[in-house]
Amino acid sequence: HLLAALGCDTLAFGAETPDAAALLDAAQLLLSGEINALIRKKLATGMTYAAARADAAETLRPGMGTLLRTPNNILGIEYCKAILAQGAALTPLALPRLGAAHGGGAGEHGGTPMASASYLRVLPLPEWTSFVPAGAAALYAKAAAEGLLLDSAKFEVAVLTQLRMQPPENFAQLRGISEGLENRLAASVRQADGLDDLYTRLKTKRYPHARLRRLVLDAALQFPAELPMPPYLHVLGARKSALPRLKYAALPAGTALAELVQVGPQAAEIGRLHSRAVDFSSLCREKIQ
């Protein structure tokens, strides 16, 4: 939505299978509706949702199930689904993921050390220097010195505090809530002694950890299920030479959020939620901002 409004014509992303046409075909199948009944049938046998969807796709389109079993392909297919659903004038460009697999350890490509983001997150910051550009490493070191990095203990307490302070009925209004998961969440937040424990208590075959983590953060931030599309383009950074392009954008664009939220009621609502998330983030850093 935002990229199309900005006038972008290509969406590039990494994929284990760098075949944009195949990923678009998979997206069309998932949007068609013909796969849903088969997914439900396979779920009834005890399969996880991810496995049921991949298996159903393989049944309907031999060879397509493989695309739905690898994480970057899955994300790329979601991008393609959004392009198709919105009728956006964007062409997907799938680039091969090389050197290190999603969620994997360190690797290399062409002699250059590579690492997944999840691998980097568990490394001490000084050990990042082999895997990131020198300029980026300097910025990370500066952020660490200023206490801007996440304090996981503060984050955990902040999330659990927000969840325990809310009435259970709030959870029914979250996006992605179904099948009574709001009741499970309401009970689990009273019993969990940490976020990992909470995710474990919530996990079912239909809801993988990644989805549950998003759900829990939505609940902590009190983000409702129904949100308008952002009615503005908030520019966080750009080359000076590129700024004139903003005048051709299909939505109001600028660097000052205080001005953008005055566009209308929807802009004010999105801006309010944005500010809430920024405040929450500021409390979860090594040095509270």
What does each of the following model-derived ranges do?
Residues 4-289:
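Active-site cores that bind ATP or allylic diphosphates and position pyrophosphate for catalysis
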